[in-house]
Amino acid sequence: VNVLEISRLSLSLGQQTLLRELSLTLHPGQVHVIIGPNGTGKTSLLRALFGELAADGGDISLDGQSARQMTQARWRQQFGYMPQNIQLELDLSVIEVVVLGRLDSLSMRLADEDILAAGRALQALGIAHLADRPLYSLSGGQRQMVLFAQVLLRDPRIMMLDEPVSALDLHHQMQLMEHLCQQTREQQWITLVVLHDLNLAAQFADQLIVLAGGDLQAFGSPARVLDAPLIERLYQVPVEVSHDHSGIPFLRTVRRQPG
C-alpha cells in the first residue's frame, strides 16, 4: 500500500525547534493541506520530506521502506515538489520549461509523447495560449501555473506544493486546486499542500495538518478540525465559523472595535 509514514520527526534550526516528534500517516488519493501561523514549520516539513533538511530525529518511510534505505536521488524520484518563491530567469519558452518535468538529467532525450504531455498539462490548466511565450515575460501568477504544469509531468507518487496559489487570482486559484484534487484522486497521489487561506483549505482538503509551536495541533477533516477556539488560539484573532449545506466550514474574521 502506498502510504507515507512520518514517525517522531524532529527538526530544528539553530536554537529554534521547528517540529517536535511529529507523527503522521498519509494515504494516497487524499489532499492533505498544511496550515498554521507563520514560522511554524510548514515549509520545513516539506523540505524534510524531500530530503533538503536533515532531521534531528525520527524517520520517514514510503511503503514501509525508510528514506535512509534509499539513495537521495531514488527517494526524490518519488516526489513532485513545487517550492515557494522559485526564481527562474530562463531564456526558454513555456512549453520548454514544462517539458523539463520529464527530465531526470540534462543528458536524457525527449520523446514526442513528452511534448504532447506538456501540451495537455497546459491545456488542462487553461494556459495553452502561453506555450510559445518566453518564461521571463510572464507575470508571477502565470509562472506559478507553468511551474505547476511542470510538476504534473513528473508522474510522482507524492505531490508537494508550497503556497502554490499565492500569486494567483481567484479564477486560477480555483482552477489549480480543482485540477490538483482531480489528479490526486485519479493518479492516487499522496498530496501535501501548504496554504494560508483557511477557507480555501477548508474547501479542498481531505485532511488538515495544523502546525503551531513545533507541535501537531490537529489532524483531521476540515469539518472536525476548523473551529473557532482553535483558530482564535493559533492566530490570535476573533473568528466566526459557519458551515455550508455539505458541512464545509467557512471562517469570517471579526474586526476588533477601536477603543
Short names for language-model regions:
Residues 134-138, 142:
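Conserved ABC ATPase signature
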Residues 99, 112-130, 155:
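Conserved ABC ATPase "signature" region
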Residues 159-163:
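Catalytic Walker B motif of ABC-type/P-loop ATPase nucleotide-binding domains
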Residues 35-37:
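The feature captures the beta-strand-to-loop junction immediately N-terminal to the Walker
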